[in-house]
Amino acid sequence: MIITIKFESKEKLVSMKQYITVVGVSVNQEGTFSWRPGTFYMKIHEESAAGPFAKGAEISDLSNSSAIGCGISINQEGGDGSIRVKESSLRKKQERMSTKYPTTMSCREAFDQLTSCYSIGGQFRSYYRYGDFTSCDKQVSKFKFCIIHGNDPVKVQEWYKDQVSNNKALENTSGVIWQERETTANK
C-alpha cells in the first residue's frame, strides 16, 4: 500500500519543500509525495507559520480511495509543527480482517485431521488430554464446511473467526484435567 498526496501545482510543492523536512518519501515530477505507511516522517520548521502550512492549513486528496488505499488528511494545528494523519477506520478494519484470518481452506488437511481424530492414536491423545474419548465433532464439521463452502473466501474467514471465538469461550486445557486428578487422588 502506498499513500500519495497530490498538489495542485509544482510551484506549491517547491515552496513547501523550504518549510518542511521529509524523510522516507519519494517525490514525483507530477508534484506528488508517495510513501509506505510507517516510513513517513515530516517535520514542519518553525518559520512555516507564514508559509503554505499557515494555521489550519490542510492538504487532502490522496490516492484514489481504493479498497487498499487510505484516505488521509494532514493538518497542522497552531504552527507548533504537529501533524495528524487520519486514516479511514473502515479501511483499516477491512485490511486487518483480510489479513488476520485465512481465505482458503484445504479439504485434504481437514480430511487428514478427521481421520487422525478417529484413529487409535487420536482417541488415546484425547483420553490422555481430556480424560475422555472424543466424537470428533469439530473435525467432522470442518470437513463438511470445507466440502460445501471451501471456495468462498468470505465464508471461510467467518468460519475461522467463529472457531477462534468458540475456542476462547471453551478453553479447557490438559491442566484442568490434571488439577481434577490431583484433587481426587488426594482424597
Swiss-Prot record:
Disulfide bond residue pairs: none
Keyword set, alphabetical order: Meiosis, Sporulation
InterPro entries linked: Pants/Emi1-like
Sequence intervals crossing the membrane: none
A GO biological process held by the record: mitochondrion organization
Superkingdom of the organism of origin: Eukaryota
General function of this protein: Involved in sporulation. Required for the full activation of the early meiotic inducer IME1.
Family listed: Belongs to the EMI1 family.
PANTHER family attached to this UniProt entry: UPF0545 PROTEIN C22ORF39
Protein name as catalogued: Early meiotic induction protein 1
Organism: Saccharomyces cerevisiae (strain ATCC 204508 / S288c) (Baker's yeast)
Gene: EMI1
